[in-house]
Amino acid sequence: MQTAYPDYRHYTAREYGTRVGLYRLLDALAAADATASFATNGAIADRYPEVIEHLLAKGHEIVAHSSDMNGTIATGIAEEEEKQLIESSLASLERVAGHRPRGWMSIARSQSWDTPRLLVEAGIAYCCDWVNDDLPYSMKTAAGPLINVPVNHELSDRQVIGTQQQSAESYAVQIKDAFHWLVGEAEESGPRFLPIQVTPYIMGLPYRIGAFEELLRWLADQGDCAFHTCGEVASAAR
């Protein structure tokens, strides 16, 4: 259903994430002694700087997530326009965080042919846009190397719950199934990476957060694995 502007129905549903859902996720992460990476728009820094401050105070990582949710990138966009979009996002986040993010996730994983090079030129060390592997890897650009950390959207709550209309409990089962499979591969072929990608306004709802807390507790109790930020994963891949 399309809602006419001003679309408060969708806007406030998502704002629930910054007002309520985020803090439930932070409590769940703290209970599991886990740090995480938060893909964050420049607009969040401009409008809700306290959100950035709370994330950093808890030891979490900020990953630049474009200027706002309309800041998609595609071939055909002028290079200067794309550079400005990247720079505006990084500058807004740096102004509040006190440091420039090392990582980048594009809106809808959108990139142009020039994006990897422009990210390196802007000081980005890794991106999370390419989902074609279970391990991070380095790619070459004309400006130098860029690490890709494959945060697969197939395992996100937006895909499993939002698109496929499954429950939070079903999401947890699928993460556990993926964990068991990857552990089996790791025993034969070396380490594997399992991204857990959740969204505050989706997983932070009161009838879903319990399943997420239980999932984190279960993962924390497993041997031979650990929670890592995307930045830590990227550093290990260098």
Residue ranges and their predicted role:
Residues 4, 32-112, 144, 150-163, ...:
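Metal-dependent polysaccharide deacetylase catalytic core of the NodB/CE4 family, i.e.
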Residues 1-12:
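Active-site gating loops and adjacent loop-to-helix segments of metal-dependent hydrolytic enzymes
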Residues 22-26, 49-53, 86-90, 116, ...:
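Generic structural signal for well-ordered alpha-helices
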